[in-house]
């Protein structure tokens, strides 16, 4: 098992989207916007990853399961899910406007597509969903749910 810190993950359509970036970069804000659009929280500020032989499964860490920080509100509890990791978005204000192809990133021995991603605009959740659909790993045949 691998534990990633300072990352947030959500499940969309049965696949996990991992969001990384420095503190205050908008990871939780993007996750909340995606949750508002129907995604489920996997983990905020930490995510467990387990290789199940076919995919890398992202799941909530037990010590913060279901908890997410909402700036200016506090810590709230939300429903959680687990899902195969399909895409990593790295929040970067200097992300190129038109990335040609996602880079491949090896996490716990599994190659995962990774994209730089400009944070903070009004449609970032919609852009993240399109990035997952366009660049993410295909949906594996696993028992993971959204």
Predicted regions and their residues:
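Conserved NTP phosphate-binding and transfer environment spanning the P-loop NTPase/kinase superfamily
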Residues: 82-146
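Short secondary-structure boundary/capping segments
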Residues: 2, 9, 77-81, 103-107
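Conserved nucleotide-sensing/catalytic segment adjacent to the nucleotide-binding pocket
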Residues: 36, 40-93
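Hydrophobic/basic alpha-helical segments enriched in Actinobacteria
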Residues: 6, 11-21, 48-61, 118
């Amino acid at each position: 098992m691998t534990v990633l810190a300072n990352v947030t993950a959500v499940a969309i359509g049965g696949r996990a989207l991992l969001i990384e970036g420095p503190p205050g970069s908008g990871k939780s804000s993007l996750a909340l916007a995606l949750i508002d659009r129907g995604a489920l929280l996997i983990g905020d500020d930490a995510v467990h990853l387990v290789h199940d032989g076919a995919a890398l499964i992202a799941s909530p860490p037990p010590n913060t399961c279901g908890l997410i920080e909402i700036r200016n509100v506090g810590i709230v509890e939300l429903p959680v899910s687990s899902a195969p990791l399909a895409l990593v978005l790295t929040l970067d204000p200097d992300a190129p406007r038109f990335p040609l192809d996602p880079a491949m990133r090896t996490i716990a021995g599994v190659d995962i597509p990774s994209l730089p991603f400009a944070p903070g605009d009004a449609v970032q959740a919609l852009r993240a969903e399109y990035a997952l659909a366009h660049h993410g790993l295909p949906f594996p045949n696993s028992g993971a749910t959204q």
